[in-house]
Amino acid sequence: MLDIENEQRNLLYNFINSIKEKGKHIKSQVYQDVFADFLISKKYNKTFLEFGATDGLELSNTYLLENYSNWNGALGEPDPQWHQQLKKNRPNTKIITECVWTKSNEEVEFLSSDNGVLSTISSFRYSDKDTMYNNAELRNKSFKKINIKTISLNDLIKREFNEISPSYISVDTEGSEYEILKNFNFSKYKPIFLTIEHNY
């Protein structure tokens, strides 16, 4: 029992040190990037897939990994208002502009909000009204609707990662996370670490 407690204490100590070391380079909200690096980098392939990437910098769960820890991967962002800035901020990363969804080769109506980080598939525009009312209000205050081609998470990994799951997958799609993951083949693709930001 004492050995387990010491091991847990050491892990926590090392994780806190990782946060201190990476300090100013951390872009994530709750240290997802540091934890992914801490968990994966010494044992597994340093590959990531982040979708809902916005500008690839602010609130990014993978910026630190790519730029300060030699990871590589792909970023998904369907909202055109972010594409120019995303390419500028992450010039060495593959950018996917299709909308990750349950199926590929469909078109979804996408709500491109003037409050860009809150953009989502139109059918999810009020998905967080009971839990994060301010988000729903801001999202729906001013926007435009556009049609965007879809790709499933399974097909995205098949195409961009040669059917080998990235070690870390970060999902932040403002409401559609569950539907996307419900159709994901967890038997075939086994990420080591998965973070899901949701509004429920």
Across the structure, where does each feature detected by a protein language model lie?
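Phosphate/nucleotide-binding beta-alpha loop and adjacent structural elements of enzyme active sites
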Residues: 1-200
